[in-house]
């Protein structure tokens, strides 16, 4: 996963931060080694960016993977990243998540945290619950938000089965970033849809 190239021109308005390889590996390990939610499954990666989670799911034996992002440039890089590690079976889709339809065994996502556009993470979580039987969704860690996310999940017919606390270390991505790497505390939610 270290070889997956980051976005060459990330857009601040879309909160495009390439998920660090270590964090992606941890999420994928939890999803497959602990819960068995990737191998032989259909997987959607919402807001896939340059494809790190999608590619990881395919490498771990997902039967069918769809990576979705609104940014055509990110999808082009994702497709090249997949090819560079010998993965050709991923369907890369340029789309707003609101237009997506279908059913997947598992949805994995590192959505925008809603820093630039309030509620962006909520839209991703609602769509993931609509599409997936099991959802892995990464959110900025905030004790006050945990109750809100749990209620939102339940309102949309899901249940939080596990909460994993993690740290991500983000390299400087935009001009206003001054730290060599920034630690971000995040929560990974495992959600089961009741639909």
Regions found by a protein language model. Give the residues of each.
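Conserved SAM-binding loop of SAM-dependent methyltransferases across substrates and taxa
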Residues: 50-62
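Conserved SAM-binding motif I beta-strand of class I
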Residues: 64-69
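Conserved glycine-centered beta->alpha loop in an early N-terminal alpha/beta scaffold
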Residues: 47
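Short alpha-helix immediately C-terminal to the canonical SAM-binding loop
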Residues: 75-76, 146
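S-adenosylmethionine
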Residues: 94-187
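S-adenosyl-L-methionine
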Residues: 1-44, 55, 76-103
């Amino acid at each position: 996963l270290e070889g997956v190239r980051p976005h060459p021109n990330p857009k601040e308005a879309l909160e495009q931060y390439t998920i660090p390889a270590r964090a992606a590996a941890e999420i994928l390990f939890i999803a497959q080694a602990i819960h068995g939610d990737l191998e032989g499954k259909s997987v959607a990666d919402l807001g896939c960016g340059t494809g790190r989670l999608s590619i990881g799911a395919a490498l771990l034996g997902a039967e069918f993977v769809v990576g979705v992002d609104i940014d055509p440039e990110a999808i082009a890089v994702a497709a090249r990243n997949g090819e560079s590690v010998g993965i050709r079976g991923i369907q890369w889709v340029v789309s707003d998540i609101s237009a997506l339809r279908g059913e997947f065994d598992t949805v994995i996502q590192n959505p925008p945290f809603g820093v630039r556009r309030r509620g962006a993470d909520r839209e991703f979580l609602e769509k993931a619950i609509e599409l997936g039987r099991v959802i892995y969704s990464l959110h900025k860690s905030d004790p006050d938000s945990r109750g809100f996310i749990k209620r939102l999940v339940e309102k949309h017919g899901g249940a939080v089965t596990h909460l994993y606390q993690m740290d991500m270390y983000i390299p400087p991505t935009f001009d206003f970033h001054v730290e060599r790497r920034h630690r971000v505390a995040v929560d990974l939610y495992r959600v089961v849809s009741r639909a």
